Design a protein with these regions (language model features):
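Substrate-recognition element of Asp-dependent hydrolases with the DxDx(T/V) motif
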Residues: 67, 72-102, 107
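A structural signal for isolated positions on well-ordered beta-strands in alpha/beta enzyme cores
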Residues: 85-87, 130, 150-152
């Protein structure tokens, strides 16, 4: 399938291509004291657990050595096979320079030094036809201005129950559904490009 260079698929890192949640939960468990409740979610962490998590994430090596997450790589391989232009879109913590450095090292090691990377505080500002991201707030922000955008979301405990008419959730069993959604987004992109081309010839603009 011939694909325009503008058919960009944006891929998140933490919880999408990297097993951020699994690794952090495992490392927090190692630091847990007897009698403390088990931590299973990162929402509403108690102060002591948040401080430990911050200490863990202060290491460049921690970010650089995060394990791959199979769900995200399944989607990546499908998008690559369809001819999407792959770009990494990840959030950069305000006060953690180690994360910025470690993420770039991870990208270089796992995806190569030539892949396009955007590290931002606001994913909603970044262009793409598709966003692959596990975090509902980031997905909603990106889709807010993109009535034709496609979201693909690797399923985890943090996004349980999330739904959106433009988002396909992937749990490891429905890769064919993900492929179809990605293919249909390319079909839509091509039809919109054709309409814009015809519109410009007739002197009006197609949105």
């Amino acid at each position: 399938m011939e694909v325009s260079s503008e058919n960009v698929a944006l891929f998140d890192m933490d919880g999408t291509l990297c097993d951020y949640h699994g690794k952090l939960l495992m490392d927090l468990k190692k630091l847990a004291r007897r009698g403390e409740p088990e931590i299973t979610s990162f929402r509403n962490l108690p102060d002591y657990a948040r401080e430990r998590a911050d200490a863990i994430r202060a290491s460049i090596e921690w970010w650089a050595n995060l394990p791959r997450l199979r769900l995200g790589w399944d989607i990546l391989e499908v998008a690559q096979g369809l001819g999407y232009r792959i770009m990494i879109l990840t959030q950069g913590p305000r006060k953690n320079a180690a994360a910025w450095t470690g993420k770039k090292l991870w990208i270089d090691e796992n995806l190569g030094e030539d892949i396009d990377v955007t590290i931002t505080r606001d994913k909603g500002l970044v262009y793409g036809k598709t966003l692959v991201d596990d975090w509902p707030e980031y997905m909603d922000r990106w889709l807010r201005w993109r009535r034709n955008g496609l979201g693909v979301m690797p399923v985890n405990a943090e996004n349980a129950g999330y739904t959106h008419p433009q988002v396909t959730r992937y749990d490891g069993t429905n890769l064919a559904e993900v492929r179809e959604a990605l293919e249909q987004r390319l079909v839509l992109a091509r039809s919109l490009e054709d309409a814009r081309r015809k519109g410009s010839q007739l002197g009006y603009r197609v949105r």
